[in-house]
């Protein structure tokens, strides 16, 4: 069974969060938490928060052991953008887009999804 966790309207662009998501995709969930602890980016904190929530959901709601879970899927979609104006010279204004994104993590059991597990690969 797959365990799904979502984090919607995150105040960071999808491009920045995808850098972190690509690092941990396919890894064991507990290993991914250790990796995220060592990355010094705001996006790493956001993904770590979501991953902890997904692990808690798996343990509490479905009775899974945390050691056997892998991140089978993680994807980041663009959310809505807040439009702001920045004053410029001669009475003009430029538009600033404050982007948001939606993060989705799907955890699965190693035994049930062995082809999705690539935790033995080294990260580039």
Swiss-Prot record:
GO terms for biological process: translation. One of its GO terms (cellular component) is cytosolic large ribosomal subunit. InterPro entries: Ribosomal_uL22, Ribosomal_uL22_bac/chlpt-type, Ribosomal_uL22_bac/org-type, Ribosomal_uL22_CS, Ribosomal_uL22_sf. PROSITE patterns: RIBOSOMAL_L22. Pfam families: Ribosomal_L22. GO terms for molecular function: rRNA binding; structural constituent of ribosome. It comes from the Bacteria. Coiled coil: none annotated. Keywords: Ribonucleoprotein, Ribosomal protein, RNA-binding, rRNA-binding. The keyword Ribosomal protein applies. Part of the 50S ribosomal subunit. NCBIfam families: rplV_bact (TIGR01044). This protein binds specifically to 23S rRNA; its binding is stimulated by other ribosomal proteins, e.g. L4, L17, and L20. It is important during the early stages of 50S assembly. It makes multiple contacts with different domains of the 23S rRNA in the assembled 50S subunit and ribosome. Belongs to the universal ribosomal protein uL22 family. This is Large ribosomal subunit protein uL22. The gene is rplV.
